[in-house]
């Protein structure tokens, strides 16, 4: 499911109820990750301190939607 967001602008609510917005630059599949989870690499993140991007795992994501 998360692979549908590759190359899209997204809005994410994480497990701490924080909102993140950015562009999904790459995805790591469960087969490729060390912990067997999906991972999203987000760039152009809307929060100070995350200028180089954000990596977030599937279990940290409560909600995700495409920003059109």
How would you describe each model-predicted region?
Residues 2-68:
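Conserved RNA-binding domains used in RNP assembly and mRNA/RNA metabolism
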């Amino acid at each position: 499911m998360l692979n549908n967001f590759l190359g899209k602008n997204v809005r994410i609510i994480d497990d701490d109820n924080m909102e993140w917005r950015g562009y999904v630059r790459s995805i790591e599949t469960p087969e490729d990750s060390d912990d067997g989870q999906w991972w999203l690499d987000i760039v152009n993140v809307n929060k100070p301190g995350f200028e180089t991007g954000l990596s977030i795992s599937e279990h940290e994501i409560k909600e995700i939607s495409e920003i059109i």
